[in-house]
A protein has these predicted regions:
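Asparagine-centered strand-capping/turn motif at beta-strand->loop junctions
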Residues: 52-54
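N-terminal post-signal-peptidase region of extra-cytosolic proteins
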Residues: 31-38, 66-68, 76-81, 92
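Exposed beta-strand and adjacent loop surfaces of beta-rich binding modules
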Residues: 25, 47, 57-61, 90, ...
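Extracellular/periplasmic metallocenter environments
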Residues: 27, 74-109
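Bacterial N-terminal signal peptides that target proteins for export
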Residues: 1-9
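N-terminal edge beta-strand
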Residues: 23-45
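Histidine- and aromatic-enriched segments that form or immediately flank copper-ligand environments
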Residues: 57-75, 104
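Sec/Tat signal peptide C-region and signal peptidase I cleavage site
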Residues: 16-23
Length: 109
């Protein structure tokens, strides 16, 4: 009986541990070659997942040299990037295919 309780406790720990490590999810939308929101606030010192939804018919590349990420998002589709943990600060990003209009910043606070 004691062995069963230990195994049950271990199974519960293994099952719940990944939930605690899950990153918070944030959404960026691309429309008319612009990111919305232009400023994305995320918690500092935590991993985050950014889902980029491209509502334009053409592809866009989410790129940030300081975040060390490049991800091409096809037109009318979505993609996911994982970043962090980030120290408090501002981390600019661009849409490389439309740099004049597709700009934004991740703000870790």
């Amino acid at each position: 009986m004691r062995r069963h309780l230990i195994l049950l406790g271990l199974a519960a720990f293994v099952t719940c541990a990944p939930l605690a490590a899950m990153a918070q999810e944030y959404v960026l939308t691309i429309k008319d070659h612009k990111f919305t929101p232009e400023e994305l606030k995320v918690p500092a010192n935590q991993r985050v997942v950014i889902t980029v939804i491209n509502n334009d018919s053409t592809a866009e590349e989410f790129e940030s040299s300081v975040l060390k990420v490049e991800k091409v998002i096809a037109g009318n589709s979505r993609g996911t990037v994982r970043i962090g943990p980030l120290a408090p600060g501002r981390y600019p990003f661009i849409g490389e295919f439309h740099e004049a209009t597709a700009k934004g910043v991740v703000i870790a606070e």
